[in-house]
């Protein structure tokens, strides 16, 4: 049986961190055990582990797959001649950096070839840290890919995607995100002529929902709004290239079948998507600007309580009602390191220069805040309830310093005049007037 991945309507399972179960053929899931002597339909049982066996049950992530051919059936991998764009990490710089949107190549480019390394804070073999990429594509993948180096968080800015994975399919559009577990095989098909966006590669603990503390049991990203796929398989006996990223390098081998051949599965180590428009935004209804941690969608913790390996934070449409308050994000010097992107609209701390598809980097203790134009307007504004609308900025925040790639420091999209946006900040100090 070969299910057509071009079908328009997809079904999903709802919830975050659930023990899901799905089968594309009735009775394909074994009952009462994981690895029977003879699995239904002559399938192979295969365990897909996302954490160590001895993790606490609340932290453990694993999925049992029942597939036509096991993943072990492949020849040796060979290092590919064409590696990821971006080059090695560049020189260390404490400077604030901002990039205009990267151009989409004119030559045929799939998701893998369109990945460009921008910043990173650790080598891929370390069990912590993140790497950040841009992706640009103008054709669907014919290859299948998996990433041995970390979990992938995809943030589209332009163009719809269909992500065909071992466990089923996810359709993704701008203002939605997808998370793909480390090692999951997938193929990305374009549903529009071009696609562009951002990828955070999480080398640390898997992403999860942040604790809500005094907010209570509801708010921010609600678990029911996360969607996991249902089983879908390809029974294709044709040459297929399988590519993996291993310690930052691309390796490939040739199969005689599609590796997206899982007929049934159960577990919690699964891909999922989330619509950012469903985020329940929290904010002040009195005065001052709360810390931006109230906008956290997902977090990857470290061993230090409250210190994130990766926080994924958004700045969505919201009402601003604070009285006697400087309403834009305040001026800041941060222990954490902030890589920001923009999906649509404008960011309320920058009047111009920060464009959809662009990015900025403010490293540890790099002073930042609203630009001169935004600051002047905010100081003199008549404070009435106002809605920030038609916007979606986001931030990958991490506790380790992010180093730009050589490409990021040399590309023409780097805005060499970024510091000038603060040059027009007025001096309003007057010792004779309080």
From Swiss-Prot:
Protein origin, superkingdom: Bacteria
Alphabetically ordered keywords of this record: Dioxygenase, Iron, Metal-binding, Oxidoreductase, Phenylalanine catabolism, Tyrosine catabolism
Active site per the UniProt annotation: 289
Residue numbers binding Fe cation: 332, 338, 368
GO CC terms of this entry: cytoplasm
Catalytic activity: homogentisate + O2 = 4-maleylacetoacetate + H(+)
Binding site for homogentisate: 347, 368
GO terms, biological process: L-phenylalanine catabolic process; tyrosine catabolic process
EC number(s) recorded for this UniProt protein: 1.13.11.5
Cofactor or coenzyme needed: Fe cation
GO function term, MF aspect, one: iron ion binding
Functional pathway: Amino-acid degradation; L-phenylalanine degradation; acetoacetate and fumarate from L-phenylalanine: step 4/6
CDD domains (alphabetical): cupin_HGO_N
NCBIfam families, A to Z: hmgA (TIGR01015)
Function: Involved in the catabolism of homogentisate (2,5-dihydroxyphenylacetate or 2,5-OH-PhAc), a central intermediate in the degradation of phenylalanine and tyrosine. Catalyzes the oxidative ring cleavage of the aromatic ring of homogentisate to yield maleylacetoacetate.
Similarity-based family: Belongs to the homogentisate dioxygenase family.
Subunit structure: Hexamer; dimer of trimers.
Protein name: Homogentisate 1,2-dioxygenase
Organism: Pseudomonas fluorescens (strain ATCC BAA-477 / NRRL B-23932 / Pf-5)
Gene that produces this protein: hmgA
């Amino acid at each position: 049986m070969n299910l057509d991945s071009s079908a328009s309507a997809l079904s999903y399972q709802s919830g975050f961190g659930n023990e899901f179960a799905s089968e594309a053929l009735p009775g394909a899931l074994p009952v009462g055990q994981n690895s029977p002597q003879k699995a239904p339909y002559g399938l192979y049982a295969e365990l897909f582990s996302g954490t160590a066996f001895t993790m606490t049950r609340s932290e453990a992530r694993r999925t049992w797959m029942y597939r036509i051919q096991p993943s072990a059936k492949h020849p040796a991998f060979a290092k590919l001649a064409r590696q990821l764009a971006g080059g090695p990490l560049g020189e260390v710089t404490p400077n604030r950096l901002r990039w205009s949107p990267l151009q989409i190549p004119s030559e045929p480019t799939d998701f893998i070839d369109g990945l460009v390394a921008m910043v990173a804070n650790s080598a891929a073999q370390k069990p912590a840290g993140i790497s950040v990429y841009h992706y640009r594509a103008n054709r669907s993948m014919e290859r299948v890919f998996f990433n041995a180096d970390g979990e992938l968080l995809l943030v589209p800015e332009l163009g719809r995607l269909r992500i065909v994975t071992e466990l089923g399919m996810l359709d993704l559009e701008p203002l939605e995100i997808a998370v793909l577990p480390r090692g999951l095989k997938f193929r990305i098909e374009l549903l529009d002529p071009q696609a562009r966006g951002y990828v955070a590669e999480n080398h640390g603990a898997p992403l999860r929902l942040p604790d809500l503390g005094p907010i209570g049991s509801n708010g921010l990203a609600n678990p029911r709004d996360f969607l996991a796929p249902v089983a879908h398989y390809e029974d294709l006996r044709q040459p297929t290239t399988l590519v993996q990223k291993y310690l930052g390098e691309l390796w490939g081998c040739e199969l005689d079948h599609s590796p997206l051949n899982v007929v049934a599965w159960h577990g919690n180590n699964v891909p999922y998507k989330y619509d950012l428009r469903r985020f329940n935004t929290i904010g002040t209804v009195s005065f001052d600007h709360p810390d931006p941690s109230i906008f956290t969608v997902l977090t990857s913790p470290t061993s230090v309580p409250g210190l994130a390996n990766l926080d994924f934070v958004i700045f969505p449409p919201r009402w601003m009602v604070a009285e006697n308050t400087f309403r834009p994000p305040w001026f800041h010097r941060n222990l954490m390191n902030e890589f920001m992107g923009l999906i649509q609209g404008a960011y309320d701390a920058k009047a111009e220069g920060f464009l959809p598809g662009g990015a900025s980097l403010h490293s540890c203790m790099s002073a930042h805040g609203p630009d001169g134009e935004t600051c002047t307007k905010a100081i003199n504004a008549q404070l009435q309830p106002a809605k920030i609308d038609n916007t979606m900025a986001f931030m990958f925040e991490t506790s380790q310093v992010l180093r730009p790639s050589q490409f990021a420091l040399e590309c023409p999209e780097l805005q060499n005049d970024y510091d000038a946006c603060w040059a027009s900040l007025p001096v309003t100090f007057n010792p004779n007037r309080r």
